[in-house]
Each structure stands twice: as C-alpha cells, then as structure tokens.
Amino acid sequence: MTLFSNKIYTKSNFTNFLLLLVPLTFIIGNVAINLNIFLFILSTLIFYKKDIFKIDYHFLDKIIFIFFFYILINGIYNNYITWGDQTRVEPYNLKTLEKTILFQRFLLLYLIVRFIVEKTIVNFRAFFISCSIFSVFVSLDIFYQFIFNEDIFGYPGNVRKFSGPFGEELIAGGYLQRFSIFTFLLFPFFFLKSKNKLSMCLTSILFLIALSSIIISG
C-alpha cells in the first residue's frame, strides 16, 4: 500500500495533499487555514462537480442542514431588523449578513468531506502520518524551548507557558490535544497489530511525549 496512487498528478492526490497540509496550516495561522480550506473547496468542486452532492443523506445530515438553514435565516432576520430600526443612530453595515453567508462555507466543506470519505478518496494513513509528524515536531519544539528558553524559530519561552512554534499564541496544548490523537492510533491502525509489543511501546512513548509537552505548555 502506497501513500498515494502511482500517478502523481491526479485529482485524489491533489485532494489528499491539501488534507496533509491541515496540521501544518494550524501551526502557520488563520490565513493559511482559510487559504487551505478555500483551495480544498474550490479544487474538489472543480474535480468532482455535481457528484459531491450525490451522496447518501442520513438523518444526521438533515439535522446539519436544518442547523445551517437556521443560522442563515437568523442572520438575514437580524440584519433586516437592524435596517428597519428607525431609531438607529450609528451607520448601517452588512457585516452580520456577510459573516452569516460566509459561515455557510462550512456546510459545503462538510458535504465535500462526506463525499471524499464515502467514495474512499481520502487516504487516512497519509493523513494520520502527517498529523503525527507535526504533533511530534510541536512536542519536540516545546521541549527545546523549555530547555533553551527559546524554540528553534527563536520564539522566547514564558516562565509559566511555552508556545513552541506558535509564538505569542499560547495554543500549543490545544493543538496537541487535537492532533496527537492521530499519533496514538497510527501504529495500531496502519502499521502494527494493536496487541504487538512494539506497537504498544511506540504508542506509549508517543503518548508520554505528547502528554509531557501539553503539561509543559501550560
């Protein structure tokens, strides 16, 4: 089993490549996250077009549709009430409506993810490996910052908290809580049997590294 298909330039490979960048974009920041989401949505719409919406819809999907529809209607209604307020002094703006409409992109993102999972386009092993690599990187960078009072990028440490590659943003612990779970499941799911001693040993070591980093990060 290879990480990608034999042909490098394929639709599935490009889609998976953007998914592999997810843990990295969270380290870089919001601009990278939003850009990656935009490219992911745009590319999948171009590649798969209407097929994205030809999935088996379940009860949970309907609940999610209702939720997003409620958010949209609520945003439009609030904006209408604001515009109809004759006693309003400050200038009108469409920020609330804009945010409501932009929020709908997450519904589209959900449908796309449902599609690529249902059609087995996503390469879970590659995604788990990517999450594991960046989780270990963040953990080791926190250790480095803890020992030398600055990380490998030169970000200084704090007396009580260490952010690693996140600089002034104290979110390293939250990052590890989200992405290190893939590290713990990598060997049991994709490389070694869950009862294998080597698998248990490697998983335990990675767990201790992540846990220690979370504690150090504050």
Task: Please provide the spans of the model-predicted regions.
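Membrane-embedded alpha-helical segments of multi-pass membrane proteins
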Residues: N30-K50, L97-L111, A172-F184
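Short conserved micro-motifs on helix faces and helix-strand junctions that flank
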Residues: F26, I71, P165, I216-S217
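Transmembrane signal-anchor hairpin modules in multi-pass inner-membrane enzymes, especially those
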Residues: M1-V89, L94, F115-R125, I129, ...
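Alpha-helical hydrophobic/aromatic positions enriched in membrane-embedded helices and signal peptides
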Residues: I66, L72, L97, S130-I133, ...
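Alpha-helical transmembrane segments of multi-pass inner-membrane proteins
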Residues: L20-V22, L108-Y110, R125-G157, G167-G218
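Short, flexible active-site loop motifs that bind/organize anionic cofactors or intermediates
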Residues: V117, F162, Q177
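Short aromatic-rich membrane-water interface segments that cap or initiate transmembrane helices
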Residues: V89-I101, V159-G173
